[in-house]
C-alpha cells in the first residue's frame, strides 16, 4: 500500500487517526484547562484540514486502483456496469408492476361503477313528493320546516346545485368517493 511518511503506517490507518483526532478536537470540553476559544478553533481547523487531506489521498489511491483494474481487466468494469444495469432494470420493472396493479384496480373500480350505473333502475318518484325550484324533491304539505338561514329546497351544505343530479351520476360520485376513501386507508377494502 502507499505510504505518506515512512513509518507512519498505511493510508487507511492515517485516515482513521485523522478522523479520531478531528472528532476529539470537536468534542473536547475543557473550559478550565487554560486554553482559549481561539486556540480550540485553531486546533479544530488544523485537524479538520488534516482529515480532508488524508481523505483526498485515499480517494486518489482508490481512483488509481480503479484505473489499473479498468486497463488491465476491462471485463471487470463491464461486469460491474452490467450488474448495476440489471439492478436498475429490476427496480424499474417492480415500479412498472406496481403501476400496472394500480391501473388494474382503477379499471376494476371504473367497471364496477359503470355496471352499477347501467344495471341500477331509476327510483320512481313518490306521489307525495314534489320537485322544488332547485330540482330537489320536497315533501308536499307541511313536512319539515326549513332551517333558519337556508332557502327552501337548498341542500344542507347551503349551495344550490346547478341542476338536478341524475341518480346514476349521484351513484357514480358516491362510488368514486368511497374508492378514494379506501385508497387513503380511511375505509377497509372491499
Swiss-Prot record:
Major localisation: nucleus
Top-level division of the source organism's lineage: Eukaryota
Pfam families: Med28
GO cellular component term of the entry, any: mediator complex
Stored InterPro entries: Mediator_Med28
Ranges in a coiled coil: 76-108
Subunit structure: Component of the Mediator complex.
Protein name: Mediator of RNA polymerase II transcription subunit 28
Species the sequence originates in: Drosophila pseudoobscura pseudoobscura (Fruit fly)
Amino acid at each position: 500500500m502507499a505510504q505518506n511518511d515512512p513509518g507512519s503506517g498505511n493510508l487507511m490507518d492515517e485516515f482513521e487517526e485523522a478522523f479520531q483526532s478531528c472528532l476529539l478536537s470537536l468534542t473536547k470540553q475543557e473550559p478550565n484547562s487554560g486554553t482559549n476559544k481561539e486556540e480550540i478553533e485553531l486546533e479544530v481547523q488544523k485537524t479538520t484540514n488534516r482529515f480532508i487531506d488524508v481523505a483526498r489521498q485515499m480517494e486518489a489511491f482508490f481512483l488509481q486502483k480503479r484505473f489499473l483494474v479498468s486497463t488491465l481487466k476491462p471485463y471487470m468494469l463491464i461486469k460491474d456496469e452490467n450488474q448495476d444495469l440489471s439492478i436498475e432494470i429490476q427496480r424499474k420493472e417492480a415500479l412498472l408492476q406496481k403501476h400496472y396493479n394500480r391501473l388494474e384496480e382503477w379499471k376494476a373500480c371504473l367497471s364496477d361503477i359503470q355496471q352499477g350505473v347501467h344495471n341500477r333502475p331509476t327510483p320512481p318518484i313518490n306521489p307525495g313528493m314534489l320537485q322544488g325550484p332547485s330540482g330537489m324533491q320536497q315533501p308536499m304539505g307541511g313536512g319539515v320546516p326549513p332551517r333558519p338561514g337556508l332557502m327552501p329546497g337548498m341542500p344542507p351544505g347551503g349551495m344550490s346545485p346547478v341542476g338536478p343530479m341524475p341518480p346514476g351520476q349521484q351513484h357514480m360520485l358516491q362510488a368514486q368517493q368511497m374508492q378514494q376513501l379506501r385508497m387513503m386507508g380511511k375505509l377497509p377494502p372491499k
